[in-house]
From Swiss-Prot:
ATP-dependent specificity component of the Clp protease. It directs the protease to specific substrates. Can perform chaperone functions in the absence of ClpP. Belongs to the ClpX chaperone family. The keyword Ribosomal protein does not apply. Zn(2+) binds at residues 13, 16, 35, 38. This is ATP-dependent Clp protease ATP-binding subunit ClpX. GO terms for cellular component: HslUV protease complex. SMART domains: AAA, ClpB_D2-small, zf-C4_ClpX.
Amino acid sequence: MARIGESGDLFKCSFCGKSQKQVKKLIAGPGVYICDECIELCNEIIEEEFSSSDEAGGVEDLPRPRELCEFLDAWVIGQEEAKRTLSVAVYNHYKRIQSEANVPRARRAEDDGVELGKSNILMLGPTGCGKTYLAQTMARQLNVPFAMADATALTEAGYVGEDVENILLKLLQAADFDVKRAERGIVYIDEIDKVARKAENPSITRDVSGEGVQQALLKILEGTVASVPPQGGRKHPQQDFIQIDTTNVLFIVGGAFAGLEDIIAKRIGTRPLGFNNDPGASEVIEGPEALSLVRPEDLHQFGLIPEFIGRLPMVTAVHPLDRKALVRILTEPRNALTRQFEKLFELDGVELTFTEGALGAIADKAVARGTGARGLRAIIEETLMDVMFDVPSRDDVSRVVVTQEAITGEGKCQYLSTPVFHGRGRLSA
C-alpha cells in the first residue's frame, strides 16, 4: 500500500504518485489507490482507442440504401428522387471507406488494382425545399461530423473574403478538432449557383468570387491534403496549420440555379420524350420539373466550369413543395413544426392545437410567399407572437386553439379554460 510519512496517515496514488492532499479524490482498491486525475486520463485513452477503431466511416453497421431512405422518410416529406439518390451515394461512399480501411494498401495493389473513386453530390432546386435539411439529417443518422458553408462568402485566395480552407475548419470544429473523424465527415456547400461564371465565354478580367472559387474548390472536392488555419481567417507564413486529407470527405453542394430550367427546356425543345412516343407528338418540359433532366452541358452553359462539373458526378433535383406537401410537413415528421410549438407551450402548462383550416392557411401563405418549408416557422411565429407574450402571465388559460382566421389575420387565437393540469403544478378552472 502506497503511504507517505512516518505515521502512514497520508496515502498516494499508485499510478502518478500524488498524495491525497494534491488531488480531489483518492479511490482505494485491494492494496492500491487511484486518483481522479488518473481516472480521467484513463477515460480519455479508452475514448481515443474506441474512436480510432471506428475509422471505417463513423458507423460500424452501415445502413443499406433502403434503410437510409426510410430514415429520411421519417424526417423529410416528399423529394423521393433526391432521397433515393442521396441514400445510394452516401452508402457507396462509406462502403468504399470501410473497404479501404479493412484492406491494407499493399494488398489492394496486389489484388485487381481497382481503386474506388469518390462521388460528390450536386443538388438542384429552389430554396426551402429541403436540400440543406436532407444533408443534415443524413449526417445525423450516420453520426459523422457535418459542416455547412455558404459559397457566396468565398473568394479566391489573396482577395477579401473567406478562403475555401475555412470550410474544412468548420468541419474540424464539428469534429471537436479530431482530424480522423473530420476526414470522414460530410460538408454541405450552399448557394453554389452564385459562384457560376458571370459569362459563358472566358473573360480577361479576374472573376475572384465566381470562377475563381470554383477553381479553388477543385482540389478539396477531389481529395487533397489541405492546410487549415486553426484560428480561421487568412493564411500567413508564421501561422501553424492543421493538415486534413479530404479524400474521404463527402461534399454535397446545392443551389437554386434559377434560370437553369430555361436552358434545359431550350435544349429539349419540343422533341418527344421516351422510346415509344409518337414521332409526331411533342412535349415541352417547363419549370422546376425540368431540373430532373439536367445534363453537364446545361450546367456548363449556366456558368459552372467543366472541371467543377466533373467532380460532382451525382446530380439530383428537389422540387417545389405544393400545398399538400407543406401541410404534411407541418404535422407528419418526427420533428414537425406543430409538435415543436406544442412542446413549447406545454412547458408553460398550456395545450396548443391547430385546426385543419389553420394548417391549410399556413401552407397557402407559404406558397404565396414562395419561401417553401423554410417560411412555415415564420408564419407560425407571427401568428403566435401575441399569444406567447400573454399566456405565460395568465393563470386562466389552459388551452390555445389556432384557427384559420388567426392565420389569415381575420381573427385571433382562441383562449380556453378547462381543468387541465399545468406543468407549473396547479389546476386551472
